[in-house]
Amino acid sequence: MEDGDWVLVENLMNSIPMVDSETSKPLKVTFNGPAKSWTDAIPIGNGRLGAMVWGGVSSEIIQLNEDTLWTGTPSDYTNPDSPEALSQVRNLVDNGKYTEATEAAVNLFGNTTEVFQLLGDIKLQFDDSHLAYSEETYHRELDLDTATARLRYSVGDVEYTREHFASNPDQVIVIKISGSKLGSVSFTVSLDSKLDHHCYINGGSQIIMEGSCPGKRIPPKVKEGDNPKGIQFSAVLDLQISDGIGIIRVLDNMTLEVEGSDWALLLLLASSSFESPFTKPSASKKDPTSESLRALKSTANLSYSDLYARHLDDYQNLFQRVSFQLQKSSNKVRENEPLVINNLMPFANAVNLKGNKDDVVPTVQRIKSFQFDEDPSLVELLFQFGRYLLISCSRPGTQVANLQGIWNNELDPKWDCAPTLNINLEMNYWPALPCNLSECQEPLVDFIKSLSVNGSKTAQVNYQASGWVAHHRSDIWAKSSASEGNAKWALWPMGGAWLCTHLWEHYNYTMDRDFLENEAYPLLEGCTSFVLDWLIEGPRGYLETNPSTSPEHSFIAPDGKIASVSYSSTMDMAIIREVFYAIISASEVLSKSEDTLIQKARAAEPRLRPTQLAQDGSIMEWGLFHISQPPPKRSSDCRRLDRPATTLESHVREAQVPGRKGA
């Protein structure tokens, strides 16, 4: 076999789930107390529905999300004044007036994105005896192998357990509450939300919550009727208890009370009126409450064991495709390193040195001790936790994983919880293919398709270009134009191009020719068409991007001022090379190498401005030798790391793939 030859290997996507029973160990994230903040709660999800389990004892909050709950409505992502503004910015860049170009770039901005919303909370209240629970008996865990959040504690001689999972087959969040003594389970349950909503009891054992998202990200201070109609939603909570033992009472038409049961089962279903990125909520024909009740009806003949078995069959088919083990003895505390034990003394009461410490040591303490014991099993856990999160927030037919996956507890979350295209969205899906979760990437492909629809209008009107374009941030409505804000992140028309590299990668892993021909290639064609029109010839004959930014980064211009707009950032050039490589390679597979577009891409690729190296040999972010980077605002400014990384990512891939040209 010659270097660079292709080798046909078995399609791992169809592999049978296997776990090495001899060396595998429980993959669990463990806690020894209730969550004190939202980020300490346990995330569960089925791709569409998400929940955060706090693990409170006398009172509990299970925070809920549904992936289509966003503010806003479909919008127009074009600006007929942009071509004139683009010409002005380009002239300023050509004349070396980078500060002025940065200021003038504001005329290329569009509106900001809409905002991902929360669904609400399940609120559980137990009687006062639970205030006296035994802290030593408390245990909360996320079992990655079963995608189940569990809670266990004792009150006197009664042990209470709660189990939580989000079923994809039945589209329901399931919670089971049990006590070790007959008739020991008593509590009240209600639903609540920060969104406009109302609740009522249905049939004596169900709570229905109906509400709506704002029609605009910041609701105007006008009469409610003047506010555009936003996405409507409904959540249905069904309550079941043990046969013949215990009763359910209705309190104030919004709360249910359970008294003296052996166990209780809560089923949470939710739906919204969202139909597509191109359908106004006011035009939706979906009835969220009817849909939720219909989904509940489909579970009528399923016991808890049935629901759990169906959940496991679905989830483990994905999760157990990959096992990851760094060393066979990773489940034991190192016995011959006194320094390790000495530094673990603060945790000594929680560590059973003769057994498997992962069953008793809270994960946060394992993280703290990692600097001393370098426990490889913690790395294994982190790896699988990443796979768990992707499975939980991105499934076929769901929305794309946003900035926080699917979990959010605020009406005004950081960065709108929006899909951020300048690295965050790509990072969400980097594990999908290498970690054998190709199905979980399907929402990303669907999202790219929606972006291409709106992006073709933005490209044509704003930039007088063919094909389609997307910028640094989007939302459920597939926003494709630049956002309001700072040019260093808003003015970046490479978002769609970078996403398209995932399409070629998907084919490389799956060898799905039908996908390549009917889904990936048309999107790559549109992306390549835009890139070719966006490139302009520079003074030295290179094809350049102008204006150009290196996302979220600035430089000190020759006039001594901070600027961010210039030409041909290394990131732009790296992404464009990736796109050209992808479509040229795809055309060879599909026998389209002679197409006009492919010939244009082949001709343009060697004319792209080459990567610039600084005097110390480092890769420069911009093609300008006479500028410098401002120091970070704070020494711990880790966000600076994501910008150079995006540039380097392409060069690393070029070095790894036979036949690829280096920049």
Identify what each model region corresponds to.
Residues 6-487, 505-507, 525-528, 542-543, ...:
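Aromatic-residue-lined binding/catalytic grooves and analogous aromatic/hydrophobic interfacial grooves
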Residues 147, 495-502, 527, 575, ...:
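Amphipathic, well-ordered alpha-helical segments in soluble domains
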Residues 373-380, 422, 497, 514, ...:
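Soluble non-cytosolic domains of exported or imported proteins
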Residues 424, 492-506, 519-533:
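Extended, hydrophobic alpha-helical segments in both membrane/secreted and soluble proteins
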Residues 490, 512-515, 633:
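Short, contiguous acidic/charged loop-to-helix segments that flank catalytic cores in large enzymes
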Residues 526-586:
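Acidic/histidine-rich catalytic neighborhood
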